[in-house]
Curated annotation (Swiss-Prot):
<feature type="topological domain" description="Cytoplasmic">
    <location>
        <begin position="1"/>
        <end position="13"/>
    </location>
</feature>
<keyword id="KW-1015">Disulfide bond</keyword>
<dbReference type="GO" id="GO:0052816">
    <property type="term" value="F:long-chain fatty acyl-CoA hydrolase activity"/>
</dbReference>
<keyword id="KW-0808">Transferase</keyword>
<feature type="topological domain" description="Lumenal">
    <location>
        <begin position="31"/>
        <end position="341"/>
    </location>
</feature>
<feature type="glycosylation site" description="N-linked (GlcNAc...) asparagine">
    <location>
        <position position="113"/>
    </location>
</feature>
<dbReference type="GO" id="GO:0005783">
    <property type="term" value="C:endoplasmic reticulum"/>
</dbReference>
<dbReference type="GO" id="GO:0006465">
    <property type="term" value="P:signal peptide processing"/>
</dbReference>
<dbReference type="GO" id="GO:0005829">
    <property type="term" value="C:cytosol"/>
</dbReference>
<dbReference type="GO" id="GO:0016020">
    <property type="term" value="C:membrane"/>
</dbReference>
<feature type="glycosylation site" description="N-linked (GlcNAc...) asparagine">
    <location>
        <position position="161"/>
    </location>
</feature>
<keyword id="KW-0325">Glycoprotein</keyword>
<dbReference type="GO" id="GO:0007042">
    <property type="term" value="P:lysosomal lumen acidification"/>
</dbReference>
<keyword id="KW-0523">Neurodegeneration</keyword>
<feature type="disulfide bond">
    <location>
        <begin position="53"/>
        <end position="142"/>
    </location>
</feature>
<dbReference type="GO" id="GO:0007420">
    <property type="term" value="P:brain development"/>
</dbReference>
<comment type="function">
    <text>Exhibits palmitoyl protein thioesterase (S-depalmitoylation) activity in vitro and most likely plays a role in protein S-depalmitoylation.</text>
</comment>
Amino acid sequence: MLRGGPCGAHWRPALALALLGLATILGASPTSGQRWPVPYKRFSFRPKTDPYCQAKYTFCPTGSPIPVMKDNDVIEVLRLQAPIWEFKYGDLLGHFKLMHDAVGFRSTLTGKNYTIEWYELFQLGNCTFPHLRPDKSAPFWCNQGAACFFEGIDDKHWKENGTLSVVATISGNTFNKVAEWVKQDNETGIYYETWTVRAGPGQGAQTWFESYDCSNFVLRTYKKLAEFGTEFKKIETNYTKIFLYSGEPIYLGNETSIFGPKGNKTLALAIKKFYGPFRPYLSTKDFLMNFLKIFDTVIIHRQFYLFYNFEYWFLPMKPPFVKITYEETPLPTRHTTFTDL
């Protein structure tokens, strides 16, 4: 079990909100031939975590194996949504539409309920910003995300400040197929991505990078269910997205090409300087000073360094710079090539 100690690499939730707070206040050469949005990189296996990376809150403490359902079982699929860190702050972050998403299942044959969600192993701050360790030449990332499956649904957690609603009904056979997909998806999609990066807020604006977070997992799960023949109800489903807005991103390189022995020392210094203010703060004064540095870099000088697919990109930022949205993504349409047997 991973726990945060006084010297551990956990980040306080308030740090992760530093740039989100900026959003509430605000409301090289371009890469030629690049595919946009940049495809999320998948891996052949999930690597072991570094002991330096410590979680303040243990990941998936009540996790259990996914059971095999009887083919003739009738299972309700539930949409689960609640404010992030609701266990600590209640509905506070719900007022800013900062929501966490999950999927629930309810078996008719057994009467048992199950929850599956995808989230960070080491909390949001660690997945969004690195640590600048004196013993490492490059920024050090504690960034992994994974699926957590466990028996039971915390009705109070989801209903009190969020949503618990049935979106579809499937068979046990379909559940088993989705369970196999979840295992494969979990082993190949290993890291969390907070930001969705776009050219602008308008409809049809170019997307440069897609987020890979809890809501993305829910949407992928719904899509896979639709591929297996699931028919969803006609209800509105909204999700939180955190946007960065920039001109065409500029590819910079990976850790070796930038921070290695033959790397670009000037660029390496600029990247480390950028990430410096995002470190855990020690006092209110420290927090305010770092916030002003972030504002100066991102808003005044319009610079942002993004780490995506274990590679660094420069984002030439532009208005409105940062924005949190809570918008509808429709439930998928059933694929007619499959039947829900």
